[in-house]
C-alpha cells in the first residue's frame, strides 16, 4: 500500500552491468601480447648469452694451434685453442663459426678463394672431426686440418715437425708457422708446400659461457611452461567472469568459484515514513526498531532485548517492501535486500553457504537490516510434502534458523521479511527470538486509499473536478500498487489525447483498465451477442439491487475488456471489514449466478452462453469454503480442509462418504442461491429490461443512472435524450443511404444503351 512516485530513482544499488564477451576476449589477447613482449625483453637482458669473438690471427703457441680473437662482448680478448677439447662438451651446441679462407696453390699461380662456414657442431668421438667447417675439417686427435676443394684434397699436419703423409696433394704447415710473419715465397722456393698459406679469420665465433650454461638451459626450458601457466590462469579467470556476467553460469558475475557467495544487494535507502501513506498502526510498530538502530545503548542499559526479526505479511502490493525501506531510510543504516529464491541453486548446500555469507557481511556492516522478500520460498514448513526431511531447502532453512538465533551471537542486525502467506512459514522461524513481531499489512480502507492517491498525485496535473475521495470510494479492494497504476494509466491516457491535465474520464477508463484490461471497442459484436451480454450484466446488477445487505452496484458496462464481454462493479455499503457474515457470502453467490439466471429466463436453456464461466468459479469457491472450512452448512462445524498452509493433493482428509456429503452440500448452496437470483429477475423483468435498454443506448451506466432506474422504473432524462439523438442519426443515415442507392440506380439506368427500332417497326409506323 505504501508507495512513492520515484521508487526506482531513489534507491542506488551496487549492481554491475554485464560485460561484453567480445571486449573481454580482445582485452585478454592484448594483455597476453603485452606480457609476451615484456617477458621477451627481460629474457634478452637477463639471460646469459654466448660471447661474440672476431678472429684476427691463427698461429702456433707453445706447440698448440690457437686463434687470437677480438671480443665484442663482455670478456675482452680471448684465446681460442683449436687443438684442445675445451669446447668439446655438451654445451657447445650453440657454437657457430664462419671463416673466410684464401688458398694459394703453387700449381695454381692465380690462386683460388673459398668461403666456408659451420655446418654442424663438434662431436666427442675420437675418430670424428672436432670442427667441420664446410669442406674444412680439423681433427684434434690426429692433428690434421684437411680442406677438400675442386682442385683436390689439401691437408696440413698440426704437429711440431714436418711430417710427410702418403696422401697425394698433401700440404704441410710447419711448427712455428705464423700467419702474420710467414715468408710464403721462401716456403715455395724450399719446396715446402704449405697447404694453407693464408687462413684469414674471419668471421664471428660465438663462445659459450660454460659457467652459466646450466642456468641458461634451465631457464630456457622452464620459462615457456611458466608463460603457458600464466596465460591459462588469465584466460580462465577472464572466461569465468565473462560467463558469470553473461548468465551462462550465474547472474551478477557469479561462477563456479563464487557460487556460494550471497546474492544480497546492498542498497542505501532514502525513504522516510512520510513517503508511506496509510498503515499508521503498522508504522508505529516499526518506530521502535528505528529507535533501536539509532540508539542501541538505551536498550542495553535497561536490559531489554530488541526484536531480532519482523515479518510483514499481507496481500500483494500493500507496501511491505516499502515499509522495510522506510525503516532503513529512517535509521540511516545499510540495507541488505535479497529474495528467498536467491539462496537456492543447482548445487546442494549452496543455500546454507549463502546464508552464512549473508550474515557474515551483515556483521561487518552492523548495525544494519537484512530484508528477505518472499521468504516463504525458503522458510516454508519443513517436511511438508517430501518423503525425506533432508532436502536442500530444509538445509537452507536450518542454517537461517541457526544464524537468527543460535550459539553465535549477533548484535545490531535486524532481519525483516515479507510474505503473502504467513500460514506456510515454519513454526520455528516464527517463534520469539527469531521473528518476534508479526505485522499484518492489509488492503487500504477508503481513508488510506485517499491518502495513497494524494501521495501519487503530487507530481501529476489533475483537474480540479476530480475528487480523490470519490476515486477512493470506487476502488474498494485496491492495493497501493493498483492505485498507483490507476493514476499512471490516467496520466498516459491524458498524454495520448494531448491534454495538459488528467480528467475524470481518464481516471474512469484507468480504473476499468486495472480491473478488466483495456477496452476492445474494435471487436465486432453482433446485435444478438450485444443484447445477450447486456441481459447477463443486468442480471448481476438486478440481483445486487434487490438483495438486502448486498454490495452497491457502482457501474455496469458491456464494452469488451480482456476476455470479458462486460462487467458489473459493486462495492461494500458499510465499513470495509474482512469479517463476512453467512448472509454476505450467500448474497455474493446469488449475485454471481444472476447473469446465468437472466440468460436462461430471457433466451431459454438452449441459448445460454459461456459468459458465466468465471461466475461459476467464484460461486463454487465461496460455497466450498463455507462447507469445508467455515462450518456454514448442514454438515456442522467440522473443518474438512485446513484453512492455513498448503493442501497436499495426495492427502486424504476425509472418507469417500464424507466427500460425497460435501459435494451435496456445495451443490445445495449453489442451487438455492441460483433459484434466489432467478426469482428476483423473474419478479423484476421490467426493471431489468430498462437496464438492458440503457446499456444498449449508452454501453456504460454508472451508479446515478442505476439508482434512478431502480427507484423510478424509467430511464433517466439524459439517456432518453441520447436515445432520441441516436434515432435521429439513424433515420438520417438511412435516408442518406436510400438517396445514395437511388442515385446509383439512376446512373446505372442512364448508362445502358437504347435499342434502335427494327425495320418492321418502322414500316408499321
Swiss-Prot record:
Cofactor(s) annotated in UniProt: Zn(2+)
Active site: 537
Stretch list, region Disordered: 730-765
InterPro entries on file: AAA+_ATPase, AAA_lid_3, ATPase_AAA_core, ATPase_AAA_CS, FtsH, P-loop_NTPase, Peptidase_M41, Peptidase_M41-like
GO MF: ATP binding; ATP hydrolysis activity; ATP-dependent peptidase activity; metalloendopeptidase activity; zinc ion binding
Biased composition (Polar residues): 749-765
Comp. bias regions, Basic and acidic residues: 730-748
Membrane topology: Multi-pass membrane protein
Subunit-level organization: Homohexamer.
Its biological purpose: Acts as a processive, ATP-dependent zinc metallopeptidase for both cytoplasmic and membrane proteins. Plays a role in the quality control of integral membrane proteins.
Name of the featured protein: ATP-dependent zinc metalloprotease FtsH
Organism: Mycoplasmoides gallisepticum (strain R(high / passage 156))
Chain's gene name: ftsH
Amino acid at each position: 500500500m505504501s508507495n512513492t512516485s520515484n521508487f526506482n530513482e531513489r534507491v542506488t544499488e551496487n549492481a554491475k552491468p554485464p560485460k561484453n564477451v567480445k571486449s573481454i576476449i580482445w582485452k585478454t589477447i592484448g594483455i597476453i601480447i603485452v606480457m609476451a613482449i615484456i617477458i621477451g625483453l627481460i629474457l634478452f637482458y637477463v639471460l646469459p648469452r654466448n660471447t661474440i669473438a672476431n678472429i684476427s690471427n691463427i698461429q702456433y703457441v707453445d706447440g698448440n694451434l690457437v686463434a687470437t680473437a677480438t671480443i665484442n662482448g663482455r670478456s675482452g680478448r680471448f684465446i681460442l685453442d683449436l687443438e684442445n677439447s675445451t669446447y668439446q662438451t655438451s654445451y657447445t651446441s650453440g657454437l657457430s663459426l664462419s671463416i673466410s679462407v684464401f688458398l694459394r696453390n703453387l700449381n695454381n699461380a692465380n690462386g683460388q678463394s673459398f668461403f666456408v662456414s659451420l655446418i654442424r657442431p663438434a662431436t666427442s668421438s675420437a675418430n670424428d672431426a672436432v670442427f667441420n667447417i664446410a669442406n674444412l675439417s680439423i681433427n684434434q686427435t690426429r692433428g690434421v686440418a684437411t680442406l677438400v676443394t675442386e682442385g683436390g684434397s689439401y691437408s696440413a699436419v698440426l704437429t711440431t715437425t714436418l711430417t710427410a703423409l702418403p696422401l697425394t696433394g698433401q700440404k704441410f704447415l710447419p711448427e712455428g708457422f705464423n700467419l702474420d710473419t710467414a715468408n710464403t715465397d721462401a716456403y715455395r722456393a724450399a719446396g715446402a708446400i704449405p697447404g694453407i698459406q693464408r687462413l684469414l679469420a674471419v668471421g664471428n665465433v660465438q663462445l659459450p659461457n660454460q659457467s652459466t650454461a646450466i642456468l641458461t638451459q634451465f631457464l630456457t626450458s622452464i620459462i615457456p611452461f611458466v608463460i603457458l601457466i600464466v596465460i591459462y590462469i588469465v584466460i580462465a579467470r577472464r572466461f569465468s567472469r565473462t560467463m558469470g556476467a553473461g548468465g551462462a553460469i550465474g547472474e551478477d558475475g557469479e561462477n563456479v568459484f563464487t557460487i556460494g557467495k550471497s546474492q544480497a544487494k546492498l542498497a542505501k535507502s532514502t525513504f522516510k515514513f512520510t513517503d508511506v501513506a496509510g498503515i499508521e498502526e503498522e508504522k508505529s510498530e516499526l518506530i521502535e526498531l528505528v529507535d533501536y538502530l539509532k540508539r542501541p545503548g538505551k536498550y542495553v542499559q535497561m536490559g531489554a532485548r530488541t526484536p531480532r526479526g519482523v515479518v510483514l505479511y499481507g496481500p500483494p502490493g500493500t507496501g511491505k517492501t516499502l515499509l522495510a525501506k522506510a525503516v532503513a531510510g529512517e535509521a540511516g543504516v545499510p540495507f541488505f535486500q535479497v529474495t528467498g529464491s536467491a539462496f537456492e541453486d543447482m548445487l546442494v548446500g549452496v543455500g546454507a553457504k549463502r546464508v552464512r555469507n549473508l550474515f557474515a557481511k551483515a556483521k561487518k556492516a552492523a548495525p544494519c537490516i537484512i530484508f528477505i522478500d518472499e521468504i516463504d520460498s525458503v522458510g516454508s514448513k519443513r517436511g511438508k510434502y517430501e518423503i525425506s526431511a533432508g532436502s536442500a531447502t530444509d538445509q537452507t532453512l536450518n542454517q537461517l534458523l541457526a544464524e537468527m538465533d543460535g550459539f553465535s551471537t549477533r548484535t545490531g542486525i535486524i532481519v525483516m521479511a515479507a510474505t503473502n502467506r504467513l500460514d506456510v512459514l515454519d513454526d520455528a522461524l516464527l517463534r520469539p527470538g527469531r521473528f518476534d513481531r508479526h505485522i499484518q499489512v492489509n488492503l487500504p480502507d477508503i481513508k488510506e486509499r485517499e491518502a495513497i492517491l494524494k501521495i501519487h498525485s503530487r507530481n501529476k496535473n489533475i483537474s480540479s473536478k476530480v475528487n480523490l475521495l470519490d476515486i477512493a470510494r470506487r476502488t474498494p479492494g485496491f492495493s497501493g500498487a493498483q492505485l498507483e497504476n490507476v493514476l499512471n494509466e490516467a496520466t498516459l491516457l491524458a498524454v495520448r489525447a494531448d491534454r495538459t491535465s488528467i480528467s475524470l474520464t481518464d481516471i474512469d477508463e484507468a480504473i476499468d483498465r486495472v480491473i478488466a484490461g483495456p477496452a476492445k471497442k474494435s471487436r465486432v459484436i453482433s446485435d444478438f451477442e450485444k443484447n445477450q451480454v447486456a441481459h447477463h450484466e443486468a442480471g448481476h446488477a438486478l440481483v445486487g439491487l434487490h438483495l438486502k445487505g448486498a454490495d452497491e452496484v457502482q457501474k455496469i458496462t458491456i464494452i469488451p475488456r480482456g476476455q470479458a464481454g462486460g462487467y458489473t462493479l459493486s462495492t461494500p455499503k458499510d465499513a470495509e471489514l474482512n469479517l463476512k457474515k453467512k448472509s454476505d457470502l450467500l448474497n455474493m453467490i446469488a449475485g454471481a449466478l444472476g447473469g446465468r439466471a437472466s440468460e436462461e429466463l430471457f433466451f431459454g436453456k438452449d441459448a445460454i452462453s459461456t459468459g458465466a464461466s468465471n461466475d461459476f468459479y467464484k460461486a463454487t469457491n465461496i460455497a466450498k469454503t463455507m462447507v469445508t472450512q467455515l462450518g456454514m452448512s448442514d454438515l456442522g462445524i467440522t473443518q474438512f480442509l485446513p484453512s492455513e498452509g498448503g493442501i497436499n493433493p495426495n492427502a486424504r482428509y476425509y472418507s469417500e462418504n464424507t466427500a460425497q456429503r460435501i459435494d451435496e452440500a456445495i451443490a445445495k448452496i449453489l442451487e438455492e442461491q441460483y433459484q434466489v437470483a432467478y426469482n428476483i429477475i423473474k419478479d423484476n423483468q421490467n426493471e431489468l429490461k430498462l437496464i438492458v435498454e440503457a446499456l444498449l443506448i449508452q454501453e456504460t451506466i454508472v451508479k446515478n443512472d442505476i439508482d434512478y432506474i431502480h427507484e423510478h422504473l424509467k430511464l433517466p432524462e439524459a439517456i432518453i435524450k441520447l436515445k432520441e439523438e441516436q434515432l435521429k442519426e439513424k433515420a438520417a443515415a438511412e435516408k442518406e443511404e436510400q438517396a445514395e442507392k437511388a442515385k446509383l440506380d439512376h446512373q446505372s439506368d442512364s448508362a445502358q444503351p437504347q435499342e434502335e427500332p427494327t425495320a418492321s417497326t418502322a414500316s408499321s409506323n
